[in-house]
């Protein structure tokens, strides 16, 4: 399959897109950043924020999958994709750097904060060794890591 990935509203590395890329590459699929001049079997569009504009141009693909909190707070990656090591090669980042979450969720119920609605109460998610997988540095993307004994102990 020919797969396109599209980060609609984020300049930061998108962990979900990196995991989707890893999943498809492991299956032997061709994965690249979406190019409007190319035709794809499937394009994954990721949108982080609800208040940012959507990609309002034609997407040349047989199938389009939109995901991320900006589109649907209830949609999540399938577990077999979510637990994969991300494909860091799609971004120009340090080869010793990893991204991930030790915990998911949030203990607070702020009206404006989507995380408790999307992920529930704070809970352990991954071990640091799962995140780094031999890399020397990690950027932890947790929303409230110090609110968890698990996150605090790591």
Where are these regions (language model features)?
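Short loop/helix-cap segments at secondary-structure boundaries that form the rim of catalytic
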Residues: 36-40, 54-61, 71-79, 130-134
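Glycine-rich beta-strand-to-loop/alpha-helix junction loops that act as flexible
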Residues: 46-47, 65-71, 142-143
């Amino acid at each position: 399959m020919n797969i396109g990935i599209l980060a609609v509203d984020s300049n930061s590395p998108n962990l979900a897109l990196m995991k989707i890329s890893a999943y498809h590459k492991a299956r032997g699929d061709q994965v690249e950043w979406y190019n409007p001049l190319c035709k794809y079997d499937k394009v994954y569009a990721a949108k982080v924020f609800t208040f940012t504009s959507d990609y309002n141009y034609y997407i040349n693909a047989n199938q389009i999958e939109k995901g991320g909190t900006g589109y649907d707070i209830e949609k999540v990656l399938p577990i077999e994709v979510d637990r994969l090591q991300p494909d860091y090669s799609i971004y120009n980042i340090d080869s010793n750097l990893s991204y991930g979450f030790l915990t998911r969720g949030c203990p607070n119920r702020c009206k404006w904060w989507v995380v408790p609605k999307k992920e529930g109460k704070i809970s352990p998610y991954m071990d640091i060794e799962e995140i780094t997988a031999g890399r020397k540095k990690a950027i932890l993307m947790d929303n409230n890591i110090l609110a968890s004994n698990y996150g605090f102990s790591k």
